[in-house]
Amino acid sequence: MSLEEKEMKYRISDIARELQVSPQEVLHFVKQEGAKVASTSSMVKSDMRELILGHFSDEKRLVDQTRKIREEKRQRLTRLEEQSRKTYEKEQQLKDSIAVFPEPGPVLKKDHVHEEPEKPAIVISESEPEVEPEVEPEQPAAAQEAEEAVPTEAVSVPEPVEQERVVPAPEKPEAEKPVPEQSSTMKAQASPEMQVTYEKPKNIGGLTVLGSIDVRSALDRGSESDRKKKNRKKRFKEQADELKGEFENAGKAEGDKKPAKSGEAKTKAPKKAAGTTGSAAEDTTSSKKKKGGKKKKPAVDEKVISQNIRSTISGMDDSSGGSGSRQKFRKMRKIEREKELEAAEAVKEAERSIVRVTEFATAHELADLMGITAKEIIQRCFTLGKFVTINQRLDKETIELVALEFGFEAEFVSEVEATEVFEVHDDSEDLEIRPPVVTIMGHVDHGKTSLLDYIRSSNVVAGESGGITQHIGAYEVTLDNGRSITFLDTPGHEAFTAMRARGAQVTDIVILVVAADDSVMPQTIEAINHSKAANVPIVVAINKIDKPEANPEKIRAQLSEAGVLVEDWGGEYQCQEISAKQGMGMHELMEKVLMEAEIRELKANFSREANSRGIIVESELDKGKGVISTVLVQRGFLKVGDPFVAGNTMGRVRALMDERGRRIKEAGPSQPVRVLGFEDLPQSGDEFVVMPTDKEAREIAQKRQIIRREHEFRRSTRVKLDSIARQIKEGLMKELSVIIKADTDGSIQALADGLMKIHNEEVKVQIIHQGVGQITETDVLLAAASDAIIIGFRVRPNVNAKRLAEKEDLDVRFYSVIYHVIEEIEQALEGMLSPELHEESLGSLEIRQVFRVPKIGNVGGCYMLEGKIFRDSKVRLLREGVQIYDGVLDSLKRFKDDVKEVDAGYECGLNLKGYGDIKVGDIVEAYRIVEKKRKL
């Protein structure tokens, strides 16, 4: 045994799986052998593995036998498949070798037989014959049927010559073994150099032609029907096999019997009279006819044979002219289809190996996703040392481990992705040009809303508190040329980062507004990063160029440093100088926006039957109307009465309003609309999807709520447990508890993000509760119980809540500008900070003489070198530069009088509290401690 084998280790569970025995049995045996193992996941060395295999040799032998049987079955199936494939290839070769017959001659009637029919003789010509255009019409019926049944190459019939002799028929080719012997044309085909000639000797009995059947007309009638034609093609192979078997049976039955038709006797004559003359062959034929006249005909259904012949000829006529190339094309198509199916199967197999699951899924849910039973999940968890039940929720690590055990890869998704409604695939013919969605971004007070005011010919700024945009405004504007543009006006304050990110996700084009009298600010850089991350084109608008201090070139230079090189400087970003107040350059800016939209070819499905989809831009709670959300429609038409699901909530559209509050009946793609009818407040950025029924919408919303609730519960529990040690360690961490109530969901998110950034190692903001709507009694009671302050952003308390807050003496603050909220919370947190202590030097003294005073101790006679010393000052005694005392004065005197202070240049006497070892030459420094307010 090599060193590598000795070092190899094996997992007990893998060995048990190989032997197909219980892992617990293997673990029990290993422990009996004295090995120290903890569980079935423990590793053992190769020598222990050999002991296990030897102990469970019977089980291993049974497993080996089972595998051997499976292998034999697999090989047998492989051989059968190979034989089937070879048989199919031979049949295809046989079909390819079949050629098309010339137009068949008239078929003879067999009802009325003349006593002395004319019998054509078969002779072989050695000289080159002249080719006649047609075969003799008096060809016997039996030979005609045989020729139709077995199509071969067309045979030319030459004129008879003087010297003729009969030769024996050559051996048939191997590929034509199933063809009946009575076909004279097949014998002629076996030797290409020989040509068959039919003679009509006089005074020879045979059949008399009394009529004919028009086979071509019957075939034409059959080919006129497309349905029958397709059915014949499908049955082509089956009919050929059936026809071949019937003729073989007929040939065997006629071997010992007299031929029923004179044509059959003529085909047998050359074989039996080999080397004789034609007359001898004729005598033999006539004698056979006399002997076998009373025998019965072979049991062959002539009607079935005739129908099969016609069907076969019809199928060959349809595929005539390039049948070989058509067969090759079919084979190529079949191979291509097989390759496509294999590729699709490989993709499906790869997709099947990935399990998209939410965190904290139950064992039953995980089993359904992997296509196994929950019992198997529980058993595998048991072998891994985890005890779970069917409805127990598994953590992330357990889900990954169990998925790997069953050959799957776990991919964790959110509750919205896990309950994805349906994927939308619109056909290109259903898509139409839609208006572009343009988001206006930039720094605070750079003129974003003023730009939109000029476009809308309205005054949005007047409606915003402090002239600062604090909501995402969605507006639809129709230009002078009839084109429509949807504008999203985002806040520029740093607290609204999430709002700007949402605006970049749903937009098509970004107008980046930069003030020409200012510079590129941090929020400008942030807007550029949001746009680039969302892969959205940027059109730069340099505003306020009408001001005398405007410097557009400086703005272009700063933008190039930020990665936005405008077209004027050879870049790819369009740029326009404007004045939102005066309207300068506005027309050119709109043209550039429309040109950018045409380049991107923005399209959407305008079908009224398509399920509508959109994005929640903003949400708010109205006292009289309830939850109102601004939805940007992206697909289809949103109509009143449509059931929908949005995030974790659902509802039915009760009313639709435009941005000016006017009621509308429907809203199409790229149109912003205010929707009434939500059960709960959705979050900004949630997807809005119209569902077929209320029941389906409610089921999806409930599933998402359950998953979200479980996530929050598990996460909060884990945070609390993890934070116990941290809280014990920190001990003196101070928190400012707040309750936030605002008018919209976006404002709440902005406030929460801004407040959570205000913290340090000593103080922080703890948001206990946040919600949309007015301040209620519940909020006041919660604030009283948790000793929190209430922040109302653009909302007020109701009468009962106001009375209760006064009774509880709670601090309730109201704001309408986000700046003021953040500033005051910062001040409150700074007041909670411990002040910083600074030392301020007051002066220094030199001890020039030491006096001994009874009951007091040593008193130093000092001279004030600089500064000033006070009675309550702290002092520090230095001897040769080394501090030997730090304390306070016990007394300060000038002559015999106590004084409060002594200035520089004066003498004084002092003694130190609790210290008397003073010497001449020591220096006394006077100082005091000053408290300084700390800043965050």
UniProtKB/Swiss-Prot annotation:
Biased composition (Acidic residues): 127-137
Subcellular localization(s) per the UniProt record: Cytoplasm
Composition bias, Basic residues: 287-297
Region (G4) residue spans: 543-546
Any one Gene Ontology cellular component term annotated for this protein: cytoplasm
Location, primary (coarse class): cytoplasm
Nucleotide-binding found in the keyword field: yes
Keywords attached to this entry: Cytoplasm, GTP-binding, Initiation factor, Nucleotide-binding, Protein biosynthesis
Sequence positions that bind GTP: 442-449, 489-493, 543-546
Region (Disordered): 102-332
Ranges for region G5: 579-581
Region of interest (G2), residue spans: 467-471
SUPFAM superfamilies: Initiation factor IF2/eIF5b, domain 3, P-loop containing nucleoside triphosphate hydrolases, Translation proteins
Keyword Cytoplasm annotated: yes
Record InterPro entries: EF-G-like_DII (IPR053905), IF2_II (IPR044145), IF2_N (IPR006847), P-loop_NTPase (IPR027417), Small_GTP-bd (IPR005225), T_Tr_GTP-bd_dom (IPR000795), TF_IF2_bacterial-like (IPR000178), TIF_IF2 (IPR015760)
Boundaries of every tr-type G domain copy: 433-603
Region feature (G1): 442-449
Annotated spans, G3: 489-492
One of the record's GO molecular function terms: GTPase activity
Role this protein plays: One of the essential components for the initiation of protein synthesis. Protects formylmethionyl-tRNA from spontaneous hydrolysis and promotes its binding to the 30S ribosomal subunits. Also involved in the hydrolysis of GTP during the formation of the 70S ribosomal complex.
Family according to the record: Belongs to the TRAFAC class translation factor GTPase superfamily. Classic translation factor GTPase family. IF-2 subfamily.
Name of this protein: Translation initiation factor IF-2
Organism encoding this protein: Prosthecochloris aestuarii (strain DSM 271 / SK 413)
Gene of this entry: infB
